[in-house]
């Protein structure tokens, strides 16, 4: 998780985790692994993520990894402007860090 915490610094411009995390430009990411896509109340998701939500799709580690490699390529129509994790950064490090946060932001 420590390596992932360093990677998350890049995400913090748009996302938050931890107790009291609020939506920013992007939704808060507490408990993202295993969470239904497009499900954070009060966040205005893209039509793409609203469709995934309606189908009951859930963020798994594998899906998140593919998404983070190329968000708009993996899910055309998403609002996320991030181009994707550089190849030298391991998505599983970031996922390990995100997994340390429960849905309520506690560890």
From Swiss-Prot:
Q: Which UniProt keywords apply?
A: Electron transport, Heme, Iron, Metal-binding, Transport
The record's Pfam families line, in alphabetical order, gives: Cytochrom_C
Coiled coil ranges (UniProt) are: none
Quote the protein name from its UniProt record.
Answer: Cytochrome c-550
Give the free-text PTM comment from the record: Binds 1 heme c group covalently per subunit.
Q: Which annotated residues bind heme c?
A: 11, 14-15, 80
Q: Which GO terms describe its molecular function?
A: electron transfer activity; heme binding; metal ion binding
Q: Which InterPro entries match?
A: Cyt_c-like_dom, Cyt_c-like_dom_sf, Cyt_c_1A/1B
